[in-house]
């Protein structure tokens, strides 16, 4: 085959295990042979619609087989897949579509109203399943590992979402890392209730499982009771989630009685696993495989395996097998054990750059290393401990919230003179946003009205849960807001 990318995977896997179940969703089950045929029909349909190699094809919808079919079909057609966060508002979706230059948007029925409201002019909007061609012979175009496979949008310190260009090689090497670290098997039954528009659910679970010939069980939304039922009824072997999801499962009334004997692997990312949560699962004979990563690394960077969870609780782990990680000082110099430094990453899983953003790319990719903006220490055994975030990012229930993006919107509200968004502790979500606002002279701002206004402009999880008003914010001599001082005073 001339196609060496992800688009060839369904064809290659169908040759090896055509009758094995690839994907389950609700009452639908697809074998690898069926998945391969469906992917080929969609790839041919995209080509018939005018999609050419390098063109961008977007997808909007919850976890569904159509997501994976569109991803692989883009790979066969040589196109670039653009998964969209269905929790975003219309203005945010418009930005991603315009920035990526997507020519086609495939969507599931529940998002038809949102799709109709989009401003994108020349965009071909197609309900999932309606672009399939009759020909199920897969196109074999020359696609290499260095070609861009997908654009995954991630906000940055500037507050404007950027499309991380992940190549076919980035995603393939990340899968190899996962297979080495977690011992995934061909009889794997992996439950995915976390959204696939995030790099972790896709890169750490779906793709490695499909590469090995296991079964991916998709849930459109997370429900702790449904997860417990699926584990029992489907004999699930692997579950992925963020700490808040695992907390909800452990708090469910059926937690103690549910049969979890089939589970072999619990993958957790997005935030460190609290010690008490790890203990609750250890009491049921279950240990987490924890990870630290980022979209720009497809996403795996550090891994803490089962054998060291109890010994290294709170650690983010050691570098993934084919990934190099070190700590750098302000001038890029190496940092000795025990001292703080910025996490920098190198390896075949690190992105090609940000789509259409050469300056932003140059800021983070320097001398072959990706500069994460996260601060950590390394202990004497080589285990990394993430201690701070240079970018002030808030992690709420596994979702990344960048204050600059929220602050940009706040400044558009009448009467807001200055503002800062910080993260504050929350028993359920780990951390939530709080807006600290300075009203302009003579302005009276109602906090509830301000938050309601934000909900029309941002995804719900990005909207701060509270507002506090103040006469002034602490600043440097040049007028830059001192976020650390804001957190100390108002957090």
From Swiss-Prot:
Gene3D superfamilies reported in the protein's UniProt record: 3.30.300.30, N-terminal domain of ligase-like (3.40.50.12780)
Residue stretches spanning the membrane: none
Organism per entry: Streptomyces sp
Thermal activity characteristics from the UniProt entry: Optimum temperature is 30 degrees Celsius. Denaturates at 45 degrees Celsius. Retains about 60% of the maximal activity at 16 degrees Celsius.
Catalysed reaction equations from the record: (E)-ferulate + ATP + CoA = (E)-feruloyl-CoA + AMP + diphosphate; (E)-caffeate + ATP + CoA = (E)-caffeoyl-CoA + AMP + diphosphate; (E)-4-coumarate + ATP + CoA = (E)-4-coumaroyl-CoA + AMP + diphosphate
Family: Belongs to the ATP-dependent AMP-binding enzyme family.
Entry annotated with the keyword Cytoplasm: no
Protein keywords: ATP-binding, Ligase, Nucleotide-binding
pH effect on activity, per entry: Optimum pH is 7.0. Significant loss of activity at pH 5.0 or under and at pH 11.0 or higher.
Keyword ATP-binding assigned: yes
Molecular-function annotations in GO: (E)-caffeate-CoA ligase activity; 4-coumarate-CoA ligase activity; ATP binding; trans-feruloyl-CoA synthase activity
Reported regulation of activity: Activated by Mg(2+). Retains 73.3%, 61.2%, 36%, 22.6% and 4.1% of the maximal activity with Mn(2+), Co(2+), Ni(2+), Zn(2+) and MoO4(2-), respectively. Nearly loss of activity with Cu(2+), Ca(2+), Fe(2+) and WO4(2-).
Gene Ontology biological process: vanillin biosynthetic process
Pfam families: AMP-binding, AMP-binding_C
InterPro entries hit by this protein: AMP-bd_C, AMP-bd_C_sf, AMP-binding_CS, AMP-dep_synth/lig_dom, ANL_N_sf, ATP-dep_AMP-bd_enzyme
Protein name as catalogued: Feruloyl-CoA synthase
Binding sites annotated in the UniProt record for ATP: 291, 295, 374, 391
Annotated function: Catalyzes the formation of (E)-feruloyl-CoA, AMP and diphosphate from (E)-ferulate, CoA and ATP. Active also with caffeate and 4-coumarate. Less active with trans-cinnamic acid. Not active with 3-methoxycinnamic acid or 4-methoxycinnamic acid. Involved in the degradation pathway of lignin-derived aromatic compounds of plant cell walls. Catalyzes the first enzymatic step in the conversion of ferulic acid into high value compound vanillin.
PANTHER family, per the entry: LONG-CHAIN-FATTY-ACID--COA LIGASE, MEDIUM_LONG-CHAIN-FATTY-ACID--COA LIGASE FADD8
Known EC number: 6.2.1.34
Highest taxon of the lineage: Bacteria
